[in-house]
């Protein structure tokens, strides 16, 4: 069976938990937990986690010089960040997309589905 990574993209300027009530935050996290638990119960979940929004390092090699440039923050040239990921077991892209289609992250951002090469 193949593995597929679901990269959960979101705009941190749009989805800000500090602007939400504690009840709303718990409701959102509950939706993610229920979805994750269902995938695990069906034997489809291979892993996953939320990533910190405000931390990280972007590393870029300078062509031919051997120098590496390191920038603070997870951001490339995009407003969106990868907020988290899941790894699912599926027979095909079609099945992976079907499994991801009711992931609660679609309420807040986009999901990029990619097959992991074996």
Question: Over which residues does each language-model region extend?
Answer:
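Conserved, structured core segments of small domains
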Residues: 1-118
């Amino acid at each position: 069976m193949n593995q597929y990574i679901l990269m959960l993209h979101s705009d941190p300027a749009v989805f800000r938990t500090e602007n939400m009530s504690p009840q709303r935050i718990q409701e959102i996290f509950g939706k993610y937990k229920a979805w994750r638990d269902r995938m695990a119960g069906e034997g489809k979940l291979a892993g996953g986690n939320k990533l910190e929004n405000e931390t990280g390092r972007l590393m870029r090699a300078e062509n031919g010089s051997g120098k590496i440039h390191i920038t603070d923050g997870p951001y490339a040239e995009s407003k969106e960040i990868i907020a988290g990921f899941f790894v699912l077991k599926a027979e095909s892209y079609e099945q992976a997309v079907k499994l991801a289609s009711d992931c609660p992250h679609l309420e807040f951002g986009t999901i990029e589905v990619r097959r992991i090469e074996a």
